Amino acid sequence: MAQHGALETLKDLAEKEVDDAARLLGEMRRGCQQAEEQLKMLIDYQNEYRSNLNTDMGNGIASNRWINYQQFIQTLEKAIEQHRLQLTQWTQKVDLALKSWREKKQRLQAWQTLQDRQTAAALLAENRMDQKKMDEFAQRAAMRKPE
């Protein structure tokens, strides 16, 4: 029974690890999604700003305003590049969290399999014991029966 309790405890710990890994994976995916949304917003803003620049250039633009546009676009490009790096980092975090979750899930399944085998072995032993008792009872009953 102590072994059964130990297996149960190990399986419970593995379940907790799987739950914790799933929570972490969810957090990493949310972070990655937010980084994707921020990057998209920056790219959209950059495209809109460039469109405004093209419109203003078509209508004529002062050189100092054109310089301001260029500087701001360069700043946006740097921000976009930084967000791309952040997105890459978030993607790596998601991949690691997913790998960890899969490993923990596999470990849990191994513990579950061991527990199932142990339960089946205990049931088989119990059935054999019952069969042995029934055979002994039948044998004693046959010996008492007068012929």
Curated annotation (Swiss-Prot):
It is found in: Cell membrane. Pfam families: FliJ. Belongs to the FliJ family. Keywords: Bacterial flagellum biogenesis, Bacterial flagellum protein export, Cell membrane, Chemotaxis, Membrane, Protein transport, Transport. One of its GO terms (biological process) is protein transport. GO terms for cellular component: bacterial-type flagellum; plasma membrane. GO terms for molecular function: cytoskeletal motor activity. NCBIfam families: flagell_FliJ. It comes from Salmonella typhimurium (strain LT2 / SGSC1412 / ATCC 700720). Flagellar protein that affects chemotactic events. This is Flagellar FliJ protein. The keyword Transport applies. Disulfide bonds: none annotated. It comes from the Bacteria. It is a peripheral membrane protein. Its main location: membrane. The keyword Protein transport applies. PANTHER family: FLAGELLAR FLIJ PROTEIN. InterPro entries: Flag_assembly_chemotaxis_eff, Flag_FliJ_proteobac, Flagell_FliJ, FliJ.
